[in-house]
Swiss-Prot record:
Species per Swiss-Prot/TrEMBL record: Danio rerio
Identification of the protein by name: Protein jagunal homolog 1-A
Superkingdom in the source lineage: Eukaryota
Key word Lipoprotein present: no
Lumenal topological intervals: 61-66, 121-137
Membrane-crossing residue ranges in chain numbering: 40-60, 67-87, 100-120, 138-158
Gene Ontology cellular-component terms listed: endoplasmic reticulum; endoplasmic reticulum membrane
Membrane topology: Multi-pass membrane protein
Its biological purpose: Endoplasmic reticulum transmembrane protein involved in vesicle-mediated transport, which is required for neutrophil function.
Alphabetic keyword roster: Endoplasmic reticulum, Immunity, Membrane, Protein transport, Transmembrane, Transmembrane helix, Transport
Protein localization: Endoplasmic reticulum membrane
Name of one Pfam family that matches: Jagunal
Protein's GO biological process: defense response to fungus; endoplasmic reticulum organization; granulocyte colony-stimulating factor signaling pathway; neutrophil differentiation; neutrophil mediated immunity; neutrophil migration; protein transport; vesicle-mediated transport
Family stated for the protein in its record: Belongs to the jagunal family.
Length: 183
């Protein structure tokens, strides 16, 4: 909007911001952490779909076992890793601290623990593959050990970041609760 003083009205150059109210930092932290957790949950869901598809295709004999290998033992408990994400999603709308704590603990049990067990389960096979070049399980022509280790590296990062942002969100909610109690 043009004014008589020039192209910009006086007082709209951003110099008058100091007196304005600002959003409290714990609200900013809460909003940004919720956003990151939602993005990570989408990535986790995509990883979960890949694992569930491999388990389903293998058990329903939709394709030959030469094309898609039988699942490793760690993949079955990992299918429960969707539960912590669901509980975390329930915690978000009303800032429910107890649901978020349950989500964080169950993420360790149902998401991270199966991945650690899987790394230990597949280590001898990975060692054999890299020492002797022999693989006995394949997923679409690729070594199943290599494919699953790649998936596990991505999954462990996703779950670690989910737990990290959940902790930041929990801290923001506790700060908000403490400030309300002080008033």
């Amino acid at each position: 909007m043009a004014s008589r003083a020039g192209p910009r009205a006086a007082g709209t150059d951003g110099g008058d911001f100091k007196h304005r109210e600002k959003v409290a930092s714990h609200y900013q932290m809460s909003a940004s952490s919720k956003s990151e957790i939602k993005k990570l949950t989408v990535v986790h869901f995509l990883i979960w779909i890949l694992v569930a598809a491999q388990v389903a295709v293998s058990h329903l004999n939709l394709v030959s076992h030469d094309l898609v290998a039988m699942p490793y033992q760690w993949e079955y408990p990992y299918l429960l890793s969707l539960v912590p994400s669901f509980i975390g999603a329930l915690a978000m709308p009303k800032n429910n601290i107890s649901y978020l704590v349950i989500s964080m603990i169950s993420a360790g049990l149902f998401s991270v623990a199966p991945l650690i067990f899987g790394a230990m389960e597949m280590f001898p096979l990975a060692q054999q593959l890299y020492r002797h070049g022999k693989a006995y399980r394949f997923i679409f022509g690729f070594s199943a050990v290599s494919v699953m280790y790649l998936l596990m590296v991505i999954a462990i990062q996703v779950h670690a970041w989910q737990i990290y942002y959940s902790k930041k969100l929990l801290d923001a909610w506790f700060n908000s609760t403490l400030e309300k109690k002080k008033k």
